[in-house]
Amino acid sequence: VMTTLREPHMVGSVRIGTPDDYVMRFMPGILSRFAQAYPLVQVELHCEPSFNLLQRQDLDLTIVTREPGTEIGQLLRQERIVWAEANGFSPHEQEPLPLAMFNSQCFCRAWACNALDAMEREYRLAYTSPSLSAIMAVVSAGLAITAQLQSLISPDMRIIGEAEGLPPMPSASIVLLRNTHSQSPVTETLAEHIVEGFKL
């Protein structure tokens, strides 16, 4: 059960690593609740793809997408990855298929490209960015399709799939990694907030 008592005098700092899409979807509520309980704790947020974060040793807590077949970390959430495009547009009908995806070293991008390769569907990486908001802006303009967590799909977009000639996508396992060399009461308390926040 998450600690709910407010401790305004607790001080310290925590370094968190997380991909950009998880920041947009989950972290605002988590950090807001944590700041209310521990207003003096400094949180240092590093946004990078999961692949890059897994190589780092200097973070206290890391939220990443787990590769299929691995058992690292504490499971926070499993969520479907879906294809999406803007309402009123049909970029999925274009040949080659225009994609808007994160830059390289993104597991979701690799899964999408591998799935399209497996069904021999021609595609092009029309737009790439490290920013989720940039990717979604391109998709909202009807310029490309994307593959993202289902919970990230906004009301101005629609989920597409096999009916539109697209391959099924796997579910993403989102996990929390703790750095055993830098644990503290502050770090563990924020970890509790993260675990609870991903359930909401």
Where are these predicted regions, by residue range?
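Flexible hinge/capping segments at coil-to-helix
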Residues: E71-S104
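Alpha-helical linker/hinge and terminal dimerization helices associated
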Residues: V1-P8
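Secondary-structure junction motif
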Residues: P91, E95-M119, S184
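Hydrophobic residues within well-ordered alpha-helices
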Residues: L54-Q57, A112, M136-G142
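Short beta-strand-to-loop elements that line the ligand-binding cleft
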Residues: Q42-C47, E122-S131
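Beta-alpha-beta core module
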Residues: E71-I72, S140-H181
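Central regulatory/effector-binding core of bacterial HTH transcription factors
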Residues: V11-P68
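A late-sequence structural motif
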Residues: F26, G165-L200
